[in-house]
Amino acid sequence: MTTDPRNLSRGTAAALDGWIDGAVHIYPLRVQYEDTDAGGIIYHSNYVSFAERGRSACLRCLGIRQEDALAALQQGDREAVMLVVRRVEADFLMTAGLGAELRVETALLKLGGASMKLQQIIRHVEEGMKIENGHILARLLVDIGCVAPHVDGGKRPRRMPSDLAERLRQALTD
């Protein structure tokens, strides 16, 4: 499934969420002043933030709105589930500076009953460069768990709803 952002009007929210190309979600962004450190390069923790934005945009591209799940939980819906980060492993390979065009690529590595493992690659793409040849700045492995409310007031792992699992499987697997 491919949605090319050039086919979307500039004002649509969909254009802000990137697109799915093959089995990879693509989320473009530009490095802003707030993303850099005193040396003018991307501050290391911002790569994790960029990856989070990419994951959220990926879910929205699949019609999964985290804000709807949060609202359902706040209203006491015991069937509502949230996807939460359990673990992040990050390798910082290169850096980029202010104004750099980046792209966050999100791919599904494994889908379990109540969890999934994603690989996220953050690339620096320079003008005229083939995107697949972009310099890899960071590579993250992210473990996500599916949780639901528990009677004790906390949250516990819960099997991912079948419609959610199927959307992920259809869009992010070859």
Predicted region positions:
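Generic detector of contiguous secondary-structure segments
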Residues: 43-45, 49, 101-104, 118
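Residue-level signal for pocket-adjacent positions within structured domains
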Residues: 31, 37, 79, 155, ...
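Generic structural detector for well-ordered beta-strands
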Residues: 28-32, 91, 143
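N-terminal first-folded block
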Residues: 36-40, 45-95
